[in-house]
Amino acid sequence: MVCTTLYTVCAILFILFIYILLFRKMFHLITDTLIVILILSNCVEWSQGQMFTDDIYYNGNVETIINSTDPFNVESLCIYFPNAVVGSQGPGKSDGHLNDGNYAQTIATLFETKGFPKGSIILKTYTQTSDFINSVEMTCSYNIVIIPDSPNDSESIEQIAEWILNVWRCDDMNLEIYTYEQIGINNLWAAFGSDCDISVCPLDTTSNGIGCSPASTETYEVVSNDTQLALINVVDNVRHRIQMNTAQCKLKNCIKGEARLNTALIRISTSSSFDNSLSPLNNGQTTRSFKINAKKWWTIFYTIIDYINTIVQAMTPRHRAIYPEGWMLRYA
């Protein structure tokens, strides 16, 4: 009788032990699963709050994506143009400038007739093209940069177009301590300032000059002269001594990244050799670079407004913002 009772108690304890063991394992398994699901769901929500994974497609309006964690206005069109074209106010002006004190409101209202939301058009002026390297950050859904074109400025126009239409990662260069080399075709030096006179001396593996004397700057080869902006290319994988006036010009070591697909360039030309294939009136090309042949700035803006669909459809709207230290003109 005692043995039977003992066996019964042992059996009950064994069953209880197995039950508790399995229950605790299941409890921990369920708890761990819920914790993992909670963490993953929060990560997904955070990533969606920081990055737009789907591009916005233009169908006549700038589409709206609301995102409280993103500092940029994602339903905007920024237009950059020279400050010099804003003229003195008054009727009967024939200089071709924007002489209307309410020009910004007028232009924005005309864009609204094309389907843009009220308040989505932002007009910004710049003083000189080198501002786009030094200070201007393009942060709208779409960005249009208007630059006057002339044969005398053809080189700088080509270089600013290369800069504006791509993303660049840059670091300051200390010319008093280091020699520098470019490591590939996407590695260039960006010079900007009031007067960038730059000369270089390539060095061999023993630090002797190749065709120049490192100790004599008069023997250096001139790569930039009397310019406000220059993208300097030298022979890759060769160290160079660099000579320039650091008080009037700054130099950055830059790597070209991806194309800035939400940005287009419009060159204003009065040249008789105008290339009509780039005109928005002729649908333009898919390079996000256009030309308008006009002298009057109201004519220029009227043309941009009328053909904004052609211009915008060549672009892709902003879908993410990158903030790593050293990036100039962050991809917006």
UniProtKB/Swiss-Prot annotation:
Q: Which domain of life is it from?
A: Viruses
- What InterPro entries does UniProt report for this protein, alphabetically? VP7 (IPR001963), VP7_1 (IPR042207), VP7_2 (IPR042210)
> Which keywords appear in this protein's UniProt record, sorted alphabetically?
Calcium, Capsid protein, Disulfide bond, Glycoprotein, Host endoplasmic reticulum, Host-virus interaction, Metal-binding, Outer capsid protein, Signal, T=13 icosahedral capsid protein, Virion
Q: Which residues form the signal peptide?
A: 1-49
Q: Where in the cell is it found?
A: Virion; Host endoplasmic reticulum lumen
Post-translation: what modifications?
N-glycosylated.
Give the matching Pfam families: VP7
Q: Name one GO cellular component term.
A: viral outer capsid
Q: Name one GO molecular function term.
A: metal ion binding
Assembly and binders: Homotrimer; disulfide-linked. 2 Ca(2+) ions bound at each subunit interface in the trimer hold the trimer together. Interacts with the intermediate capsid protein VP6. Interacts with the outer capsid protein VP5*.
Q: What does this protein do?
A: Calcium-binding protein that interacts with rotavirus cell receptors once the initial attachment by VP4 has been achieved. Rotavirus attachment and entry into the host cell probably involves multiple sequential contacts between the outer capsid proteins VP4 and VP7, and the cell receptors. Following entry into the host cell, low intracellular or intravesicular Ca(2+) concentration probably causes the calcium-stabilized VP7 trimers to dissociate from the virion. This step is probably necessary for the membrane-disrupting entry step and the release of VP4, which is locked onto the virion by VP7.
Q: Which family does it belong to?
A: Belongs to the rotavirus VP7 family.
Q: What is this protein called?
A: Outer capsid glycoprotein VP7
Which organism's genome codes for this protein? Rotavirus C (isolate RVC/Human/United Kingdom/Bristol/1989) (RV-C)
Q: What is the lineage of its organism?
A: Viruses, Riboviria, Orthornavirae, Duplornaviricota, Resentoviricetes
